């Protein structure tokens, strides 16, 4: 099991838990919209660090982005396994061809 899979399992386990017991439970209790907002905030912070060129800060912000992405997915009952399946289906396909095939 990868660290992302363990993180996704932990996030899933926080659903329905007392919001005062964990940050993840609190985010999930606030609903998908709040989870999406937090994901967006963290993505912007990662972008800022990418522009600044601070590798350590970028790695830290990227970790926050991944965490908040998993929380946002969980808030809408989309599993990490589902996302990984989409990526696996796209593997080996040109990005241009894959994008054209969506239309």
From Swiss-Prot:
Its EC number is 3.6.1.31. The keyword Oxidoreductase does not apply. It catalyses: 1-(5-phospho-beta-D-ribosyl)-ATP + H2O = 1-(5-phospho-beta-D-ribosyl)-5'-AMP + diphosphate + H(+). The keyword S-adenosyl-L-methionine does not apply. Pfam families: PRA-PH. Keywords: Amino-acid biosynthesis, ATP-binding, Cytoplasm, Histidine biosynthesis, Hydrolase, Nucleotide-binding. CDD domains: NTP-PPase_HisIE_like. One of its GO terms (cellular component) is cytoplasm. Pathway: Amino-acid biosynthesis; L-histidine biosynthesis; L-histidine from 5-phospho-alpha-D-ribose 1-diphosphate: step 2/9. It is found in: Cytoplasm. SUPFAM superfamilies: all-alpha NTP pyrophosphatases. One of its GO terms (biological process) is L-histidine biosynthetic process. GO terms for molecular function: ATP binding; phosphoribosyl-ATP diphosphatase activity. Its main location: cytoplasm. PANTHER family: HISTIDINE BIOSYNTHESIS BIFUNCTIONAL PROTEIN, HISTIDINE BIOSYNTHESIS BIFUNCTIONAL PROTEIN HIS7. NCBIfam families: histidine_hisI, PRK00400.1-5. Belongs to the PRA-PH family. This is Phosphoribosyl-ATP pyrophosphatase. It comes from Cereibacter sphaeroides (strain KD131 / KCTC 12085) (Rhodobacter sphaeroides). The gene is hisE.
